[in-house]
Amino acid sequence: MSQFFSAGVAAEFFPRWQALVGAAREILERRSPAMVDPAETFITGEGKEICMLVIPHHWLGGVSLVIVARPECIDLRWAVVTDLRDHDQIDLGKVVDGWPSLDAAVQALDPVVVQELSRFIQWSCVYRGEAARPRRIRASLDLNGQLSRLDVVSEFSLWPWPRREVVERTSLSSTNPPAFRLPVPIGRLLKQA
């Protein structure tokens, strides 16, 4: 039994999407991306019709590659997933590809997911002075020549404190974790899935 997508809602709850779940599991098992912990990948959804496969980066605080399957279409997107009380964070994600049907998605999924596993993520942490904890954390992705920003943590301040910014590059397939690590809030996410 695969360790990928074994958490959250059971795959059997989504009989319509079994082929998609199987294809995604096979890709992750074959590629085994270093920054993806199989125990942190999970399935959630809205009823039996909408299935969401969430693949978080182990150290980016919820930055995730998400496959969203709806009856009318299937898409692949990047989102910051830290709260599943509703699926707004997933809905507001940055779509990178989409397909009109299950068959089209299963056939095209492999090269697209493999490309996304290697997509560089710019991980930016802004600190106030010499503080150890960042006040702002964001992930940025180059999607079709446009820099798309995903805010992970943002503490607003009216004071113009001296600041320093630390920028790193990582991906789901990177072998080395970023220097500043923000664990996925997996306990809370699985309770809400």
Language model feature labels by segment:
Residues 30-79:
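Amphipathic, interaction-prone secondary-structure segments
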Residues 55-58, 79-85, 140-142, 153-155:
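Secondary-structure transition/turn motif
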Residues 13, 55, 74, 95, ...:
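Acidic, low-complexity intrinsically disordered regions
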Residues 81-123:
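Long, charged/polar, surface-exposed segments that mediate recognition or autoinhibition
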Residues 1-11, 111-193:
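Acidic, proline/glycine-rich low-complexity IDRs
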Residues 1-51:
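N-terminal domain-onset segments
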Residues 73-78, 101, 157-165:
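Short, surface-exposed linear segments at secondary-structure transitions and domain or protein termini
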Residues 58-66, 82-91, 145-149:
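Short, surface-exposed beta-strand/loop "edge" segments at domain boundaries and coil↔beta transitions
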